[in-house]
């Protein structure tokens, strides 16, 4: 496997050439200081040979197949490790989420994978399509990875950054969604790590979801985020210079280099609280704003933002901003997240 990986020098190419399955390969030494193992197609683990690490880090991309910049970003980091330019000093699990959709150049094959975690893949119709099957496998790999880390002792930090890009433009180009975590403070250190990575906007979610990051946060108490790194572009057409800060901070993280983070300062970041989500209840749901409205566009109290079933849907707060508006989702799914500025969030 090592010869195969180093020969092709492109883990993404290997994954996309085998979108459904790759036989697992046991850990093999790399340059005398790193162990590399393959668990499945798009599932690669690096860990230091000496076992001396303190963090278990999951970097996932490609859960949506047309969100290519994070895929290219992670593939570049993988390539640098395989070719000896980077030496990982923490345990790292790289996941390329949806190879079939990447090959298609589409967001999904049959269903939105990022609504299928925390067991949702097996509810309703069950494991009825490739996204549901893959989501279940990805849960298994994350579980295995974090549980193997726990064997190395208590006090290890668990991290999961699920990387995406957005369909539409945004008033804040890069932003992160902090999953709902009742009874746990939000991490100021993590927020400032994101800021140093160029992600200066954070949304605090208000309820459980079935996203990949919520799965890791809830089940393993990981510092987990859904991170949006800009706008969707076709593979090979991303300006990777826009991700220089993100790449640098990820490199420091997996190589256990000093992060040099500023103390938490809410004036240096944009913090939003999710105040509600609006679900599609009937087929005639429609927004009143244009299809190219940017994420974080705000509307005043009383403004009609959508209609469905002959009823107007109004802005309820003094002002509410929209994120991820999509009127074309199936009935029963979320059409938009509504935001207000976060007031005194519990950050430690």
Curated annotation (Swiss-Prot):
Residues the record lists as binding Zn(2+): 64, 67, 164
CDD domains: M14_ASTE
Keywords of this entry: Arginine metabolism, Hydrolase, Metal-binding, Zinc
Annotated pathway: Amino-acid degradation; L-arginine degradation via AST pathway; L-glutamate and succinate from L-arginine: step 5/5
UniProt keyword Transcription regulation, yes or no: no
Catalytic residues (UniProt): 228
Co-factor(s): Zn(2+)
One family name in Pfam for this protein: AstE_AspA_hybrid
Gene: astE
Catalytic activity: N-succinyl-L-glutamate + H2O = L-glutamate + succinate
Domain of life: Bacteria
Described function: Transforms N(2)-succinylglutamate into succinate and glutamate.
SUPFAM superfamilies: Zn-dependent exopeptidases
Protein name: Succinylglutamate desuccinylase
Species of the source: Shewanella amazonensis (strain ATCC BAA-1098 / SB2B)
Biological process according to GO: arginine catabolic process to glutamate; arginine catabolic process to succinate
């Amino acid at each position: 496997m090592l010869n195969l990986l180093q020969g092709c020098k492109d883990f993404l190419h290997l994954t996309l050439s085998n979108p459904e399955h790759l036989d697992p390969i046991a850990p093999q030494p790399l340059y005398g200081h790193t162990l590399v193992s393959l668990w499945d197609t798009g599932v690669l683990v690096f860990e230091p040979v000496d076992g001396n690490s303190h963090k278990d880090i999951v970097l996932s991309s490609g859960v949506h197949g047309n969100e290519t910049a994070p895929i290219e970003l992670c593939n570049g980091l993988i390539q640098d490790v395989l070719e000896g330019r980077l030496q990982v000093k923490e345990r790292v699990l790289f996941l390329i989420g949806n190879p079939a959709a990447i090959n298609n150049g589409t967001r999904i094959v049959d269903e939105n994978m990022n609504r299928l975690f925390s067991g949702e893949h097996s509810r309703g119709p069950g494991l009825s399509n490739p996204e549901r099957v893959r989501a279940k496998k990805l849960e298994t790999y994350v579980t295995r990875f974090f549980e193997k880390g726990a064997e190395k002792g208590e006090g290890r930090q668990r991290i999961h950054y699920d990387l995406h890009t957005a369909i539409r433009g945004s008033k804040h180009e890069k932003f992160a969604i902090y999953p709902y975590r009742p009874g746990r403070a939000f991490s100021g250190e993590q927020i400032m790590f994101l800021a140093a990575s160029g992600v200066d906007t954070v949304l605090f979610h208000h309820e459980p979801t079935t996203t990949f990051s919520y799965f890791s946060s809830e089940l393993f108490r990981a510092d987990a985020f859904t991170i949006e790194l800009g706008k969707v572009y076709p593979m090979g057409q991303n300006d990777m210079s826009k991700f220089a800060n993100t790449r640098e901070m990820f490199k420091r993280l997996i190589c256990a280099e000093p992060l040099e983070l500023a103390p938490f300062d809410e004036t240096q970041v944009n913090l939003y609280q999710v105040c509600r989500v609006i679900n599609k209840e009937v087929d005639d749901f429609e927004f009143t704003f244009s299809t190219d409205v940017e994420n974080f566009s705000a509307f005043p109290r009383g403004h009609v933002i959508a209609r469905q079933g002959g009823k107007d849907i109004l802005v309820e707060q003094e002002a509410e901003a929209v994120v991820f508006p999509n009127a074309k989702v199936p009935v029963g799914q979320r059409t938009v997240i509504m935001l207000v500025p976060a007031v005194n969030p519990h950050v430690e």
